[in-house]
Amino acid sequence: MLVLSPSKSTQKLEFINTIQLLGVSYHFEHEIEESLSEIYNGYEEWIGESHNLHAVALSFRLLRQQGYYVSSDVFRKFTDDQGNYNKELVNDTHGLLSLYEAAHFRVHDEEILDEAINFTTTHFKLLLPKLSNSLSMQVSYALKYPINKTIARAATRKYISFYQEEKSSCDQVLINFAKLDFNILQKMYKREMCDITRWWKELDLANELGFARDRVVELYFWSLGVYFEPQYKVARNILTKVLCFVSITDDIYDTYGTLHELTLLTNAIERRNIDAIENLTSYMKLFFTALLHFYDEVEKELEKENKSFRVNFAISEMKKLVRAYFQEAKWYHGNTVPKMEEEYMKNGIQSSANPTLATASWLGMGDEATKEAFEWISTEPPILVASSNIARLLNDIVSHEREIERGDVASSIECYMNEYGATKEEAYMEIRKIIENNWKDLNRGCLKPTTVPRVLLMPVLNLTRVAEFVYKDEDAYTFSKNNLKDVIFMVLDDPIEE
């Protein structure tokens, strides 16, 4: 299909963009890489001639999205001598939307893209009431969930409905294919969910540990945000189970365990020995036994493919996570407000759970996940630190008020206010800046050349996207009966009418 598309660069880019947004690009990964590589090689020549904002912004985004570094200077042709975007651009809604989406792939020292986000966001808010209903919905969705900061399946479900509205440009064959593909995958996800739910019920931890959040469906959706493609069925299964254990661990350390109990559990997990069970309380014995059994089962399965070495890396990250949770518990019980950078943020890399989840996300992946790759991710490379910082801080912002009422450990908000004498609003503003700076680091880490194959970096990026989605305006994981419930229903349970 892709090979038959017109050879002109802009038309090719439009087609690639459409199949990506419709969620079917995973069928054409090789063809897309070939096409974008060809476009990248001749990029400087043809882009210099183009004064079409949509074409320039679209090419910039798709190339960066694929890992190709292209200069943001290409947008200078759309600015005046002071570096401000030309006012007449506001009449080009599609161009403006493309610029907005492209700017979210910015790295450090790209003020022109910082300005692009300010410019497009400001003007879209003014333009919204004047746009057609269909375009207004599309822009509103983009303002809340830009392409680089959303869950692919949720965006696909929305975009299919947007695309159908564009009667003049809608390719009927393509839209029918996208709907069919979405529904086929949805049926597969339902079967996967049945397997996970059966495992969860047999484990019975939700009943035995009544204080813990029972969110197996939400956690499956979380793993689906990391990889939705059919070939990652085993990886999704393992990651969802790890997410279940991480969620329970968080609740034990955050809300239920006494410091003495947590000391014993931390030591038991460090030792990873069933003999350590003797000193634990009854509910911790159940949890600890289930955790050991889970990793043993994964190890046996991976041994069949000579990949059992991966489990030791996953367990090592789980131990680091438990240490980080335990450190937070000690701060809480000691009424300590840690230093923002050298204490809270350093510990927060692990307490975000992203290093544990990123490593676990590779357990069921293909041969690209080598021992060297696992060794690399265990060193906390910059891309993982950025991802973890974003997840940690987003969680802190949306849970801050609730945790103050509950008397939880000091979050980054309190740490910043305490250290810099800032107001709550100033702390929020600064922390949002820190989040955006970490996104720039993350975007940089996804550009070629990369230390490990890009297929391994995608789960790290997608874990961050899930955090952006789940912690957008609220803690949608803890309070999942709100907006998240509707999104999960659309993705997992509501087929598209073909």
Curated annotation (Swiss-Prot):
GO terms for biological process: diterpenoid biosynthetic process. Mg(2+) 3 binds at residue 403. Disulfide bonds: none annotated. Pathway: Secondary metabolite biosynthesis; terpenoid biosynthesis. Keywords: Magnesium, Metal-binding. Pfam families: Terpene_synth (PF01397), Terpene_synth_C (PF03936). A motif (DDXXD motif) lies at residues 250-254. Its cofactor is Mg(2+); Mn(2+). InterPro entries: Isoprenoid_synthase_dom_sf, Terpene_cyclase-like_1_C, Terpene_cyclase_plant_C1, Terpene_synth_N, Terpene_synth_N_sf, Terpene_synthase-like, Terpene_synthase_metal-bd, Terpenoid_cyclase/PrenylTrfase. The keyword Magnesium applies. Mg(2+) 1 binds at residues 250, 254. It comes from the Eukaryota. Binds 3 Mg(2+) or Mn(2+) ions per subunit. Mg(2+) 2 binds at residues 250, 254. GO terms for molecular function: magnesium ion binding; terpene synthase activity. Sesquiterpene synthase involved in the biosynthesis of volatile compounds. No activity detected with geranyl diphosphate (GPP) and farnesyl diphosphate (FPP) as substrates. The Asp-Asp-Xaa-Xaa-Asp/Glu (DDXXD/E) motif is important for the catalytic activity, presumably through binding to Mg(2+). Belongs to the terpene synthase family. Tpsa subfamily. This is Sesquiterpene synthase 15a. It comes from Solanum habrochaites. The lineage of its organism: Eukaryota, Viridiplantae, Streptophyta, Embryophyta, Tracheophyta.
